[in-house]
Amino acid sequence: MPRKKEQASKSENEKQTSNVQAQDFKTAIQPDTATAQLIKTYSNPKQRGDKGEIVYDGGQSSKLAEVVDQTTEPHNADGAVKDGRIAPVKLDLEKQKLDKLKLFEASPFDPLTVKNNQDVVDKLYATQSSSIQEVVPTKTFATELQFGVTSEDMAKIYGAVVAVSKNVNSSVTYEVKRGTHELIKVPTIPHNLVLIQSDNGKHALIKEDLGQWPVETGVSLVNQAGVFAVQLANKLGIDKPFVLDAGSNYFTDTSFIDTRKYCTDGLSPREIQKALNRQRAYYDRPELTIAENRTLLSQSIVYPDVDGNDVSVIFSGAMSHAIFTYAQSQWSKNIIRLDDYIREITLTVPKHYRPRRFKEIEHTHGYVYRELNQGSLLPLVDANLKEASSYYFKKLMPSISNVPVDARTLQSATSALAADTGLVDRAPHVSMLTNRLTTANASSVRAITVLTCMFKQFRIGMTYSPDPNIMDVAAATCMLLFRPAQSISDEQYRYCLQTMAVFLTNTTYDIVNNDTVDVLKTKLRNQGWPLVERYNAIEVDMSVEPLRSPGQVGRYYNPFNIDPLTKKHVEDRLEEFPNQVQVGRFRNVSNNAVGAALAAFLRACRDKTSANWKGYSILVSRYRSLIPNELFESLRNISGEYNINPQDEHSFFFALAQINADEEFTGVIDKESAEYLDEYATLAREISNSLTLVKAAFGPLERTSGSILNHANNLNKVINRVFADKPLISETMLKILTIDGTTGKDGYRNWLDKLVGHNYPVYVEPVVNIVNFISARFIADSSYFGYTNEIMIMPNHITVPVDDRFGFRDSPFCMSLPRTIMGNEVRRISYSVFSMMEDIDEVISEGFILYDAYFNFTYDIMTTDGVTRLKEDILVVTDTGNDIKPIHFYIYFENKNDKKLRYESKMNVNYRLYIKTPACLLPLNDYMRAQHEYVSPSSSRVYIKDPAVVYTRS
């Protein structure tokens, strides 16, 4: 219950709030209102209400806004700067009365009900969803305002937005993410400690219980450790991005003046206090004094640290602490401030995008979890280059083909060409060029054009008529002149020159088949044909980094070989070349009919590309931003896969359409980025998993018949295991691996087979580091997890120096297994030798240490008095060999000097089993060794639930 002072304060605040609600509001929230002051003055983010609850009412539905007469708003039309936009829409909030505004006004921002800054942000958004906290924007429509409204309300709002945005560029929003995750808040610290005390209080210990993790001998311990590590990480809740939020888990002692905050996490000091008092009572000693109790209680506290962090000092397991804090450090590397995240991601989008608005409190205290590291896609692409290339090219083609264009009619293009050539004797050649014009395949040629500028190794082909005509020459010329050199193979280049030579010199392919490129170029120049070169396109640096290419510059080839600085073709003499062609005498005729027709065609294509290249350049850059640099460098198509018909080629450039990438289409490209990013992330994760699988399951492959057979068997086992329930891989990878017609199983098998022997780096992300850390501890500290690599069997009559710190009767634990006992060396026998021994009576009578195997053990610690024993005899002797049964101890405390139990201990046992003391056991008197620190980041932090940054083209 709150104290009187708190109740009075709360009552006063409620009175203030009710007074504020009676006011008449002109805007959604006024800076000088009592509510605004309350919002500004909340002080202690740790304070709660009586029950810590958040209460606010959804209210009654009412009209969200009404549009009033536009003429009521003054409009600047006569100033030095004239505003050409339609007068803005004014929202009349007077007519809303207080229905919606009361919700915002009554939102519980009283300091006593605010838990932390996250709570404040949640309440701000909750209020905003049912009232107008922000006036409808003029350019950006925030969709979060739509919650709970009716279709009629939506019609009015959209009508207002449309009216406001007339004569203004419309806006589109989309989400851009870079490996972002929602952080899991861990509210309490897992300590995994159990305090065990004998019935009479004489003995007590603290045990860290992480569960039993049985291992198998003959199977790689590293691999088993990895499996257990994943399970343990999941059990501890650290396998996903998390943040510790335990700074408010404390209480204060009101019985005396004390400002300390006593932590409620971990093993309770009260339990330790009770155990110590029981132990003191057994020895007839007084209980802990008040001062000693306070000292013990103060061993588990919460205190503030730098940057507003809270340090919780608690009693917890040493292994739990090591694993938890390591995992915390790994995930925290990727937790950054919201503003830093915005700056990072702003570099990855076009300059004309801007981040959406966040609350001021989010900018001040906001944090985001993001992964900066990126896994490589090359292990998949290198091994499946043809399939991966085919997949992505076919994925891009339909999208690019659908780009809106402002097409020029073929009739107008034909008329222009006829007017340029003029003379009647040129008409047949003009007709040959114009009659074959078509736009049927323009969209696919346009898509191929974009792909040639997007990829370094995208090659195109073209097959000409066996008896070339003027259209073939026009198409070949367009290919050499307007397509980047890297997209034209040497064979295709020579073929283009041959086609030109055959037509322009009026010869046949047989005559020029053996001519080299240089010979062909010389022939054409001598004939008066100057267009014989391929041209290296200008590489343009992108203003943003491509997806999954952090910190890297993305590049693409500027379309049509236009230099973006001069806005002209990279061939400086292109202005003169048509004039040279026009006067040429081709095909061994006396007139220039062929030259004039081709010159007019070239001028039209030159002018078209010079006028329209910008739209294509923007289109290329937008799609190129979807492609990681490593795919830009590596993807390549097979020869002949993307051939262009000469008719389509000459038609495309002659009637080149202007790109009309409107807001809707650009928005489609923007939204595709999220799909591509998610797909890349999925593939990278699966590649990393597959590499880990290969490295774990297959060692270096020796080229011997036995090893190859063993490798094949192991591969079959792996495939059958990972495809037993459902495929380990996603639909995307299945599509890539099955392009050549194989099944998913066979495709994955073939790929894994290719990965064996390659030293591809494994993408090390936080969860991999965490699993590796747990695996290493699992191997190094085996006794924590219930297995050991050596045990000792001794006859009952031999006295063994045991670990007596815990007060067990006939303890099976030794600080370390002795190498000598009573001056005699203890025999060591490997498990494999022991299993084949014919007679073990002698070794048992002398005692021995068994090693070279993994021995699983479990134990129950009984609080009553008794004789420590094994659940059953562990030695198994048969005609075929010897073995060790599962080891399970029943361990009893020695609570008193019991003669009967002492005799039972000596008389009924032939041999005893000893192991090294499990490191998870701690005597009660050493309880301070269980004290560990955990750091909770400042409770003033606000973790952005949806960290995707929305960008708006304005």
Swiss-Prot record:
Main location class: virion
Q: Does the keyword Metal-binding apply?
A: no
Which compartments is it annotated to reside in? Virion
Where does the sequence pass through the membrane? Answer: none
Task: List the InterPro entries hit by this protein, alphabetically.
Answer: Seadorna_VP2 (IPR026384)
Query: In what ranges is there compositional bias, type Basic and acidic residues?
Result: 1-15
Which cellular components does GO assign to this protein? viral inner capsid
Where are stretches of biased composition, namely Polar residues? 16-29
Q: Does the keyword Nucleus apply?
A: no
Which interval of the chain is the signal sequence?
A: none
Record's keyword terms, sorted: Capsid protein, Inner capsid protein, Virion
The segments labelled Disordered in the record are 1-29
The role this protein plays is: Self-assembles to form an icosahedral capsid with a pseudo T=2 symmetry, about 60 nm in diameter, and consisting of 120 VP2 subunits.
The protein's name: Major inner capsid protein VP2
Q: Which organism is it from?
A: Banna virus (BAV)
Its lineage opens with: Viruses, Riboviria, Orthornavirae, Duplornaviricota, Resentoviricetes
Query: What gene, per UniProt, encodes this protein?
Result: Segment-2
